[in-house]
Amino acid sequence: MAAASPVCGSQASAVGASSPPAPAPAPAAGLGRCRMALLLAVALDVAGMAALLTGVFAQLQVRGRDFGDLLIYSGALLVFLSLLGWILWYTGNIEISRQELERDYGLRPSAIARLARKLSRRWSAPATASPRTTAGLRSARRANRAPQPSSSGSRRVRLQLATLEAGSVAAGTGSE
C-alpha cells in the first residue's frame, strides 16, 4: 500500500536495512499518527449518516418522484466506504518494535522455505536452458500428456475454424 504512506507517514524502515536502530517512536498523542485517514473516515461517516437519515425521514419529491431511496442507498454506501478510512487509521497506529518484526518475519531456514526454493529452481531451470533444450523438453511433455488412442476405433479429429464471407455463403461455396 504505497498510497497509505503519505497519509500515515513512514513508521519504520525496512527490516533488512543496514541503518542503525532508530529510537522508539514517541507514543501517539490524541488522535494518533494518521490524522488524514481519521478525517476521511469521520467525514464519510457524517455525510453518509446525514444522507441516510435525510432519506429516511424527509419526504423528498421532485416532479412527483421520490428520491428518499437514492439518499438511503448513497448514505449507506458512504458509511461503508468510511470503513477504508477507519482501517487505514487503525493500521497506521499499530506499533511493532524492530525486534518483534525480526523475530516474526526474520529469515529463518524452514522446511517450507526450502521446498519453495527447490520448486522455484526446478520450474525456472527450463527457462534458463538453451532454446533447443527447452523445445525438446516441451515436446517430451506434450508426448506424455497426449491421450493414447483407444483400440475401440476412435480417431482424432482436427477442427479448423475459418471466417465465412457473405458472398460465399449465398453461393454455397467456400474456401476450405
UniProtKB/Swiss-Prot annotation:
A cellular component annotation (GO) from this entry: membrane
Subcellular location: Membrane
TM region positions: 37-57, 70-90
Keywords per UniProt: Membrane, Phosphoprotein, Transmembrane, Transmembrane helix
Domain of life per record: Eukaryota
Cytoplasmic side: 1-36, 91-176
Ranges annotated as biased composition (Low complexity): 9-19, 124-135
InterPro entries (UniProt xref): TMEM238 (IPR029365)
Region (Disordered): 1-21, 124-156
Keyword Transmembrane helix: yes
Keyword Transmembrane: yes
Topological category with respect to the lipid bilayer: Multi-pass membrane protein
Extracellular topological intervals: 58-69
Phosphoserine sites (modified residues): S175
Principal location class: membrane
Protein name as it appears in the record: Transmembrane protein 238
Upper lineage: Eukaryota, Metazoa, Chordata, Craniata, Vertebrata
Gene this chain is encoded by: Tmem238
